[in-house]
Design a protein with these regions (language model features):
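Flexible, gly/pro- and Lys/Arg-enriched active-site loops
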Residues: 2, 54-61, 79, 86-190
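A residue-level signal for conserved active-site and pocket-lining positions in enzyme catalytic cores
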Residues: 16, 45, 67, 155-156
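Short, conserved charged micro-motifs
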Residues: 22-23, 73-80, 115-116
């Protein structure tokens, strides 16, 4: 008998397509079910949170959540699963950071850095204006902006408070505590 190596995948999920929290929450539940059906592993999910659209004023509020998935999938296979689920649920990628039926982001896979430390560090340091107009051509892990986003860190602390960012050396809890309180003031559990 051989053991299967399980990776800890951190996912962020969000929806603001309907403009109604209850409908968007239902879309997140549908996405969770699809993720569970697409893998042989475990999934732990955070509470659901109402969060302002990012950038602020760009659309209706989101319902956001995070999940920890223990699976033998590679980062690329998990990303492909997330994109397939988004497409099946009707997500069309037209506007960067625009309104969406479902958004499933692969935040991190354990302590892996992809494609390399320098590339991820470069994307982490991009000014907001550049972040809004540029998109990476390949998978970046950890997600280059997760440490700056309250709408990610608030639900992520529910399921992975002690996960440590391999570039910053900070835990999720520490990254959340380092945010400006204004960044999380409007984030509310549903």
């Amino acid at each position: 008998m051989h053991s299967v190596h399980r990776n800890m995948h951190l996912l962020a999920l969000g929806s603001n397509a309907t403009g109604e929290s209850s409908s968007n929450a239902g879309l997140l539940a549908q996405a969770y079910d699809a993720i569970k059906a697409g893998l042989s592993g475990t999934l732990r999910s955070s509470r659901l949170f109402s969060t302002p659209a990012f950038p602020k004023g760009s659309g209706p509020d989101f319902v956001n959540a995070c999940a920890v998935v223990e699976s033998d999938l590679s980062p690329e296979a998990m990303l492909a699963l997330c994109h397939r689920i988004e497409a099946e649920m009707g997500r069309v990628r037209t506007q960067r950071w625009g309104q969406r039926v479902i958004d499933i982001d692969l935040l991190a896979v354990g302590d892996q850095i992809l494609p390399d430390r320098a590339t991820v560090a470069h994307w982490m340091e991009l000014p907001l204006e550049d972040q809004m107009r540029l998109a990476p051509e390949h998978l970046l892990l950890p997600h280059p902006r997760l440490h700056q986003r309250g709408f990610v860190l608030v639900p992520l602390v529910d399921v992975a408070p002690d996960w440590v960012h391999p570039l910053t050396g900070q835990s999720v809890r520490a990254m959340l505590e380092a945010l400006d309180p204004a960044e999380i003031a409007e984030i509310r559990p549903i």
